[in-house]
């Protein structure tokens, strides 16, 4: 039986780097080797569309945690609104005793963190320390994230990319 992975992502059509990475995963061997369920927490559009997408995602995630019971939750996070949307997912997974991998994409996450008050920094640390692993996109990001989570829990995985054959001929 395949292990179940719930991947928490932006909409497959949203603009941005996380979407490119996630769409690469969707079309890779990963979805053959694991039973992957994707939950979209963000979409491009109006405030109403974005809020509706997030609320719908929380309900889907609660249902998934309770009834599908994934072996792992893989959260793709960034700074700003992305952090806050994923924080609730991490909290729900933690309460459900589901391990979480936090894949941090935001190049400006360290600045987001550093500009926060001590109280908000502690909140960020508390949430991110509920994750069993944190994925950094470079050694430099690993150093920055080590201010928030224990360095031994951080792994460096460069952005996923697919080369188009016509570009390398």
Language-model region placement:
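Nucleotide-sugar donor-binding and catalytic loop/hinge architecture
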Residues: 1-4, 164-169
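An amphipathic, basic-hydrophobic alpha-helix
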Residues: 34, 47-96, 119-122, 126
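Donor nucleotide-sugar binding/catalytic pocket of nucleotide-sugar-dependent glycosyltransferases
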Residues: 123-125, 129-167
């Amino acid at each position: 039986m395949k292990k179940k992975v719930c991947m928490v992502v932006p909409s497959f059509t949203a603009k941005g780097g996380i979407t490119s990475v996630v769409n690469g995963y969707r079309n890779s061997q990963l979805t053959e080797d694991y039973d992957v369920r994707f939950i979209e927490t963000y979409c491009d559009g109006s405030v109403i569309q974005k809020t509706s997408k997030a609320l719908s995602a929380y309900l889907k995630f609660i249902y998934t945690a309770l009834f599908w019971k994934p072996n792992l939750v893989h959260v793709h996070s960034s700074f700003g609104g992305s952090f806050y949307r994923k924080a609730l997912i991490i909290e729900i997974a933690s309460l459900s005793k589901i391990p979480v991998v936090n894949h941090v994409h935001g190049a400006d996450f360290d600045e987001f963190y550093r500009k926060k008050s001590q109280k908000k920094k502690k909140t960020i640390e508390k949430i991110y320390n509920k994750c069993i692993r944190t994925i950094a996109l470079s050694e430099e990001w690993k150093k920055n994230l080590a201010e928030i989570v224990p360095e031994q829990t951080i792994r460096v995985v460069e952005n996923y990319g697919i080369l188009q054959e016509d570009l390398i001929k």
